[in-house]
Amino acid sequence: MDKKSARIRRATRARRKLKELGATRLVVHRTPRHIYAQVIAPNGSEVLVAASTVEKAISEQLKYTGNKEAAAAVGKAIAERALEKGVKDVSFDRSGFQYHGRVQALADAAREAGLQF
């Protein structure tokens, strides 16, 4: 089993549990160059809000889009957008990525900006 298939296996297990709970999910995906976040409705088929370092508004503020500062900017942006939509409580879906580094920075920034998980 390679690294990617192991990550996908972990993500599938976590998502199955979150689906049973019927929770609104804050989903994170990372690549070496960018980080993406989406808030997905409990039915799993509707993206309520999204933010990423690909967006011009966020990437213009940053020197580099693949570090913790960029992840924190995305976390703050996703929290502000979710609160505007009326979403306050979410479940954090780390997509099988280790809760460390950029994933943790995004989560901490989202919590500081007002999301609860």
UniProtKB/Swiss-Prot annotation:
What's the source species for this entry? Edwardsiella ictaluri (strain 93-146)
Q: What name is this protein filed under?
A: Large ribosomal subunit protein uL18
A molecular function annotated in GO for this UniProt entry is: 5S rRNA binding
Task: Output the InterPro entries linked to this UniProt entry.
Answer: Ribosomal_uL18_bac-type, Ribosomal_uL18_bac/euk
Keywords recorded for this protein, A-Z: Ribonucleoprotein, Ribosomal protein, RNA-binding, rRNA-binding
Which Gene3D superfamilies does this chain map to?
3.30.420.100
What does the annotation say about its assembly with partners? Part of the 50S ribosomal subunit; part of the 5S rRNA/L5/L18/L25 subcomplex. Contacts the 5S and 23S rRNAs.
Q: Listed GO cellular component terms? A: cytosolic large ribosomal subunit
Q: NCBIfam families recorded for this chain?
A: L18_bact
Task: Indicate the family of this protein.
Answer: Belongs to the universal ribosomal protein uL18 family.
Q: What does this protein do?
A: This is one of the proteins that bind and probably mediate the attachment of the 5S RNA into the large ribosomal subunit, where it forms part of the central protuberance.
Q: Which GO terms describe its biological process?
A: translation
